[in-house]
Regions:
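AAA+/P-loop NTPase substrate/partner-engagement loops
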Residues: 26-56, 63, 83, 152
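AAA+/SF3 P-loop NTPase mechanochemical coupling elements
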Residues: 67-71, 89-92, 107-126, 176-179, ...
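Conserved catalytic/switch belt of AAA+ P-loop NTPases
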Residues: 76-116, 138
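Short loop/turn elements that form and flank the Walker-type P-loop nucleotide-binding site
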Residues: 2-4, 27-28, 46, 54, ...
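Conserved C-terminal "switch" segment of AAA+ ATPases
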Residues: 68, 128-138, 142-204, 209-223
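Walker A/P-loop
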Residues: 2-36, 65-66, 95, 99
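The Walker A (P-loop) glycine that initiates the GxxxxGKT/S ATP-binding motif of P-loop NTPases
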Residues: 10, 47, 78
Length: 267
């Protein structure tokens, strides 16, 4: 039996591509990623015929070459950003790639021989399904990725973002301490997003500034502590102002609730 083609749908920064990497690790397979954003030529998928100057295989076969195996986990990133023009429709070319009944004989124009893609586990990502053609969408099983809550962002930052940023900047864990209060303030007052990309940028900004301070101190025993009181020294003025409840009831004034991709808000 053929497996389903997975489509991860969610706002930027919610971990869609990372889940694809985790699937590859869990299955013990090679991982390859193809960015489809802005592709508007069918030849980018199927390849160019050899009669053209500068002809080369399509991105699918290039990815298979990079993986070096016949059964990788292939992530097709930003499948909702495909475009089309006089060069053809790349989304239509993907129909053969993602159809389990047809991809066992996928033919790249450059190679001009059938190639079996049936052993490849395809994972697609998109921010929305509105721009994905219906025939292509019907071939995939859509899985929605909701935005993270403040509590989830806190734990992601503690377990993953901060350790990774410290390692990238070459800072030992004991040299930089970001208090829980400061981390929560970053989430609530410096970022407003469904994912954690802006949160990651804020943490990296703090680590870069801390690295400069540590170099100036020239002491391996130096320790920098980032708290709520000195957080503005690293990130500047807060960007998000938490809504305050009305102190007094005024005639003709009501409090409204709103929902966006970044979460809830008070009007």
């Amino acid at each position: 039996q053929y497996g389903s083609i997975l489509l991860f749908v969610g706002a930027p920064g919610t971990g869609k591509t990372s889940i694809g990497q985790s699937i590859a690790r869990a299955l013990g397979r090679k991982y390859v990623r193809i960015s489809l954003g802005g592709i508007r030529d069918e030849a980018e998928i199927r390849g160019h015929r050899r009669t053209y100057v500068g002809a080369m295989p399509g991105r699918i076969m290039e990815a298979m070459k990079r993986s070096g195996v016949s059964n990788p986990v292939m992530v097709l990133d930003e499948v909702d950003k495909l475009a089309k023009d006089y060069g053809g429709d790349p989304a239509s070319a993907l129909l053969e790639v993602l159809d389990p009944e047809q991809n066992s004989t996928f033919t790249d124009h450059y190679m001009n021989v059938p190639y079996d893609l049936s052993n490849v586990l395809f994972v697609c990502t998109a921010n929305t399904t509105d721009t994905i053609p219906e025939p292509l969408l019907n071939r995939m099983e859509a899985i929605s990725f909701p935005g993270y809550t403040a509590v989830e962002k806190y734990h992601i930052a503690k377990k993953h973002l901060i350790p990774k940023a410290l390692e990238t900047m070459g800072i030992q864990k004991r040299m930089l301490k970001i208090t829980d209060g400061a981390l929560r303030q970053i989430i609530e007052e410096y970022t407003m997003e469904s994912g954690v990309r802006d949160l990651k940028k804020c943490i990296e900004t703090i680590c870069r500034s801390a690295a400069v301070e540590l170099v100036k101190k020239e002491s391996e025993r130096s320790v920098i502590s980032v708290t709520k009181s000195n957080l503005s020294d690293y990130l500047g003025r807060k960007q998000i102002h938490p809504e305050q409840k009305l102190s007094s009831k005024a005639p003709g004034v009501v409090t409204g609730l709103a929902w966006t991709r970044a979460g809830g808000a008070i009007l």
